[in-house]
Amino acid sequence: MPMDIIKGNLDGISKPASSSRSRPGSRSSNGSLEVLTPEPGSVKIDMVNKLNSGQEGHTSNSGVEERRNSNDAKWADDSKTKPAKESSDEDPDMPQPQATPEHSDDPKLEETNAVLQNAIRKMHRLDKLLAKKQCREKEVKKQGLEMRVKLWEELKSAKNTEDLENDEELGNTKKFLCLTSESAGKAAAEALHCEFEDALFSVFHTQIPPETYENLMEKDFTCDVEKNEPLIITEKQPFSNTEAIEPRSEDSQGFIRQNAEHSQDFIKRNIELAKHSRSPVVMVEGEKKRLDELLQGLDDADSGLSSAEGDQCGWLVPGEGYTLAATESQQLAEIDIKLQELSVDSPTIFSLESQSHKGDMECDANEERNTEPTPGEKILRDRKEQRDRESRLRAIDGKLKELSEQVEECPMITPSKRNERITWRWLLAKILEPE
């Protein structure tokens, strides 16, 4: 409610004490503030009455003074009872802030000082609770490290002694030990044996580290509003803000360094990818090396197949077409030897046929080697050869069926060795006869 003063003097308004006045930039200023609020409605009525008559104004002023004195007594009682209640919750070891004595009769200043003192006590109590919670968090982390070291030792002992209940548990333990590096257990043990460092980050950037909280409680604190940084002033030796938060700055610096390295790696990878932007598959050097290792592992796995599969893959040489395997060439050589033994009358026919057949195969192989077909032509040629082989096999099966039927219908009358040789020679010639 605004106060309209039409006429009168300001002698009735009390002035603040000289000790409560302070400049905003001075460091020696006390914690008191001066709050000016508009006068209540009763004062306005008293001022109007004072303008009307001097005697009535004198009586009204005396009434106002009586009311102020009664309000003073009430605020004094409240300020005595409230700190007594709040001090019961506080720690007795915590130093209590000492209020500066002010020789002033203004109830507003006393009220403001009481509110500020209560707020300071509450702030100190909350700081103490925060420090206790941080100590509790340290203890929990320490217990976690102890349990991790104990678990690691149990797993190592179980692996060495193999006294587990079943094979599944043993297998799971071995898998866990393979996946988890030994450096994790060593790091946990070293962190447990060495001094447990404070890895907690402050909630606010103006928070004081808990290890220096108790030492700095009795010292003078001021806050620079422009920089928004706490300035700690000591009597013996002043130190900067960076020295005050040195235990916490190591972890933050490591985190910042790790982020910087990650960003540099990301930039390098983008540069490497930009170099190979025209290639169909974009890979950096590390990815190429990893791909080569995987392909090499696949080649090693393929080389460890069975001997039969190895023999089948051995005679399929890329770019040379179909070639006979070693076993098939041996079988053909044995057949040629048998034919030479059986062909007593006409040995030249089979030799000429075999030579011509070998010559044709060599010519075909030379032609295939000389001409380098494209991938599409190679696929067409392979399909054509496959169809030719299938048709040839079908024809051979038909001839064999016809020969078997002829043999069943016309049994041999003269079972002599010569006739048998001629018959076998004729059968083999029919089978090996090219289309």
From Swiss-Prot:
List of residues that carry Phosphoserine: S87, S88
Keywords: Coiled coil, Phosphoprotein
Lineage: superkingdom: Eukaryota
Composition-biased stretches (Basic and acidic residues): 64-87, 355-371, 378-393
Expressing tissues: Detected in male germ cells and testis.
Coiled coil: 108-154
Low complexity bias (residue ranges): 18-32
Composition-biased stretches (Polar residues): 50-63
BP GO terms, sorted: acrosome assembly; axoneme assembly; cilium assembly; homeostasis of number of cells within a tissue; mitochondrion organization; single fertilization; vacuole organization; vesicle budding from membrane
Annotated spans, Disordered: 1-109, 354-393
Gene Ontology CC annotation, any one: motile cilium
PANTHER family per UniProt: FIBROUS SHEATH INTERACTING PROTEIN 1, FIBROUS SHEATH-INTERACTING PROTEIN 1
Subunit structure: May interact with AKAP4.
Protein family according to the UniProt entry: Belongs to the FSIP1 family.
Name of the protein in question: Fibrous sheath-interacting protein 1
Species, as recorded: Mus musculus
